[in-house]
Amino acid sequence: GFKDWMKKAGSWLKKKGPALIKAAMQE
C-alpha cells in the first residue's frame, strides 16, 4: 500500500538524494 511505497521512496532518497543534490548544484 501507500506506506510501503513511502518506505521505498524514503530509502531510495537516502541512497540517491545526496548524488542528486550534488548534480543539481553543479549545473
From Swiss-Prot:
GO cellular component, one term: extracellular region
Disulfide bond entries: none
Subcellular location: Secreted
Keywords: Antibiotic, Antimicrobial, Secreted
Any one GO biological process: defense response to bacterium
Tissue note: Expressed by the venom gland.
Superkingdom to which the source organism belongs: Eukaryota
Family: Belongs to the ponericin-G family.
Described purpose of this protein according to its UniProt entry: Has activity against some Gram-positive bacteria and S.cerevisiae. Has a non-hemolytic activity.
Descriptive protein name: U1-poneritoxin-Na3a
Native organism: Neoponera apicalis
